[in-house]
Amino acid sequence: MIELHQVSKSFNVNGKTVEAVKNVSITVEKGEIFGVVGYSGAGKSTLVRCINLLERPDAGQVLIDGKNLSTLSSKELRVARRKIGMIFQGYNLLKTATVYDNIAKPLKLEGVPKDEIEIRVNKYLSIVGLEDKRNNYPSQLSGGQKQRVAIARALAHEPEILLSDEATSALDPETTEAILQLLLKINAELGITIFLITHELDVIQRICDRVAVMENGHLVEQGTVLDIFTKAKHATTKRFVGSEASFDIPQDLLEKYIATGKLVSLHFIGDEADEPALALVSRKFDVLPSILAGGIDHLKNGTLGKLLVHLKGDEAEYSKAIAYLKESGVVVEEVELL
């Protein structure tokens, strides 16, 4: 378990104090995939580096399985860090070392026996699907393959926690999807807790169980991925998930629709995404629904259907229709112009 209690971290930049992380508290359960999302400068990278004390917090506590890392001696901290692997956007591979040696060298420095190193390197190269690349050099690999080597290197220490600092942000969409599937596999098969930071909402929705949203060093909202997608409260979260969204429909067109009825965002969760609730509205009530835009998001634990709908009818019938949709399990939010 990862517990952050009122963690703060600041830096001195050109004589000025910059507060990168401000009183952040997060609890991540064992075996969970937890994501932190935010725009550039939100404090995400500083926060993730506080977990293994690559950045030592100015205030607050970082607890791993109940143990306060800040109180450990240098030797004890080195031992604790072996259970916390980390991958980065930039891979950080040794250019003059083979794939095998990039994974093996850190183990040698830890004093792992040669036979055990051979076993671990082969095991984790197999898990990341690079058995045939063990004698290649980084320059001979694609970006996705380099990231797989970095993941294998982190796993070779057999950690209980894997930290990911924007690990997919430099990859193309297809390679990103492959890396995300690999992280899901690692989580499911090895039981490793994953704490990742990203500015890509697709990453969050594809693999995370829960998510926190950061802005200007503050944690502004957190919850399950489904709750964040359907019940976003903070303005920053809403900008990310588009819960106030217009699906990129021009503002003047939105104004036209709102002037002639109600504009609502509908979210159909799980099995409800396949139910004809909206189709039944026009039969049961004196309202005319028009679908303006829509889509389906595939979350880690289910499906989320999204529709932007114009409802035309009198206020009483509109209220009945909305009540019916909510009773049918649909999350309804009236869209207002910003």
Curated annotation (Swiss-Prot):
UniProt protein name: Methionine import ATP-binding protein MetN 1
Record function comment: Part of the ABC transporter complex MetNIQ involved in methionine import. Responsible for energy coupling to the transport system.
Cellular component aspect of the GO annotation: plasma membrane
Organism phylogeny: Bacteria, Bacillati, Bacillota, Bacilli, Bacillales
Reaction(s) the record says it catalyses: L-methionine(out) + ATP + H2O = L-methionine(in) + ADP + phosphate + H(+); D-methionine(out) + ATP + H2O = D-methionine(in) + ADP + phosphate + H(+)
Location of this chain's protein in the cell: Cell membrane
SMART domains associated with the record: AAA (SM00382), NIL (SM00930)
Family under the similarity heading: Belongs to the ABC transporter superfamily. Methionine importer (TC 3.A.1.24) family.
Major location (coarse): membrane
Organism: Listeria innocua serovar 6a (strain ATCC BAA-680 / CLIP 11262)
Ranges where the ABC transporter domain occurs: 2-241
